[in-house]
A protein has these predicted regions:
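Rossmann-fold NAD(P)-binding glycine/threonine-rich loop
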Residues: 1-22, 27
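Helical "substrate-binding/catalytic lid" subdomain
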Residues: 8, 12-13, 22, 35-168
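A common structural junction motif
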Residues: 30-34
Length: 168
């Protein structure tokens, strides 16, 4: 889990409601704390609910990361109107290239967003740090291994009839 890497342990325990009072103090002692030492840990439901909540949490996390990647890539390509575009049967000519002549420093934008935007977050902190160190993100694969959690979340949404286009 990322809790080890981030020092943000946020257990999402499930199980017998009768057992929770006996283990609550242990879970809350090791969990992250916010606002006056309030633990980031609560019992989330019966047996299996903790895994289910964590699965959906990770699906949301993947959606957020994808949104950052897509948005920052749009900013990164905002200078395409300056460059001579390729024209072929496979690539349509750009309409209105004059609208895409911005040379945007995505590392600076990510830093700005992480300091005061509604989308500021730990994930954006990591993104801004990575862009500052390596603005072109050279050497990165641009993909992550499939742990299955994203697919499980989408399958659960389909199974229970909840539209989840962002997570899909």
């Amino acid at each position: 889990s990322r809790a080890t890497m981030t020092s943000r342990a946020i257990p999402m325990p499930g199980g017998s409601p009768a057992a929770w009072p006996h283990v609550k103090d242990i879970f809350q002692a090791v969990s992250a704390k916010v606002e006056g030492n309030v633990p980031c840990c609560e019992w989330v439901g019966e047996m299996g609910a903790g895994h289910y909540v964590k699965m959906v949490h990770n699906g949301i996390e993947y959606g957020i990361m994808a949104a950052f990647a897509e948005g920052l890539n749009i900013l990164n390509k905002a200078d395409v109107g300056i460059q001579a575009g390729e024209h072929s049967a496979e690539v349509a000519p750009m309409e209105e290239p004059e609208f895409y002549q911005f040379q945007i420093d995505t590392a600076k934008v990510a830093e700005l967003w992480r300091r005061g935007s509604v989308i500021s977050s730990w994930l954006l902190d990591l993104t801004a740090t990575a862009l500052h160190a390596n603005p072109r993100l050279e050497g990165l694969a641009g993909r992550v291994s499939d742990s299955g959690e994203g697919r499980w979340t989408v399958k659960a949404a389909v199974d229970i009839g909840v539209p989840a286009p962002v997570l899909a």
